[in-house]
Regions:
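Residues that flank catalytic or metal-binding motifs in active/ligand-binding sites
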Residues: 5, 44, 53-55, 83-85, ...
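N-terminal beta-strand motif that seeds the catalytic metal site of vicinal oxygen chelate
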Residues: 1-18, 40-42, 84-91, 140-151
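Active-site/binding-pocket entry motifs
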Residues: 54, 65-66, 145
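Short, well-ordered beta-strand micro-motif
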Residues: 47-49, 61, 90, 128-130
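Vicinal oxygen chelate
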Residues: 1-2, 89, 98-151
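Conserved beta-strand in the GNAT
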Residues: 57-58, 138
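Core segments of cupin and vicinal oxygen chelate
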Residues: 12-57, 103, 120
């Protein structure tokens, strides 16, 4: 048995339509499938597919009863993180995507920057935002992570 890759990440939306709009308008995901499932109190859910068709996000409405780490926060100031820290998406231009996200209601987290990681140095260009739904999203330009593994 071998892992083929990450199938999807699931997000519970405080405002389903606004969260859907953010992922489709800013990150250009498409709705691949939409459903409801009353047995799990799911009024609205969908699977979003990235432009390269390799990344999926499962989006649930706020009332859905879904397996999750920790307890659901009643207020934004109650949010405490578990193991998952942020979502990172490859983009062509981190600065442009960051600005587009801010224009669509995201809040600044870490402004666009260039980092040098490790030895030999790998240059990473990235930026992070708090999405309108609250998750932290990193926009990162392509990095050849295999370069260090090879040698």
């Amino acid at each position: 048995v071998s892992i083929k890759g990450l199938a999807h990440v699931a997000i519970q939306a405080k405002d389903y339509q606004a969260t859907l709009a953010f992922y489709t308008e800013v990150l250009e995901f498409k709705v691949a499938h939409h459903w409801s499932l009353p047995a799990f109190k799911i009024n609205e859910a969908c699977m979003l597919l990235s432009p390269d068709q390799r990344t999926c996000i499962e989006l649930f409405d706020d009332e859905a009863v879904i397996a999750a780490q920790g307890k659901k926060a009643k207020r934004e100031e109650d949010v405490a993180h578990g193991a998952l820290l942020h979502l990172a998406f490859y983009v062509d231009n981190a600065r442009e995507t960051y600005q587009k996200a801010l224009a669509h209601g995201a809040k600044a987290c870490i402004e666009p920057d260039q980092l040098s990681l490790g030895e030999p140095p790998l240059i990473v260009r990235n930026a992070l935002v708090h999405s309108p739904n609250g998750e932290i999203i990193e926009f990162i330009e392509e990095v050849d992570w295999t370069r260090s593994a090879e040698g």
